[in-house]
Amino acid sequence: MIIGITASCFDLCHAGHLEMLKYCKKHCDYLIVMLQTDPSIDRPDTKRKPIETVFERYIRLKNCKWVDEIIPYDTEKDLENALKVLEYDIRFLGEEYENKNFTGRYIPGHLEKCHFNPRKHSFSSTNLIERIKSLKEKI
């Protein structure tokens, strides 16, 4: 059995999240989703606080047919520790991380397990928020 793992905040779950989860599950038998509670905890300059609670995001992921297990985590250090302890065969990351410094990159043997999935769309939580803001201004 091939075990895959991916990590994100999954705030305002949108089409891009679903395409990514579907892609991950297509390449593994069992998919573990690491759910970040709040990325602004240790990256306040680059990440925003989630709009949805971790429980709302958990419920949505729990009901997604491509997700087999959900593990919440708080910080990037928590994620790194999980990557060191959990057993998995493939870690899925977006292709935009391939040449970047990402959590877990320097764990011995980890980079060989990384699969950088293609992003063939422009869906994002940031774009969704901007669209909602522009609609609100028109009301």
Residue ranges of model-derived segments:
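Nucleotidyltransferase catalytic core that binds NTPs
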Residues: 1-139
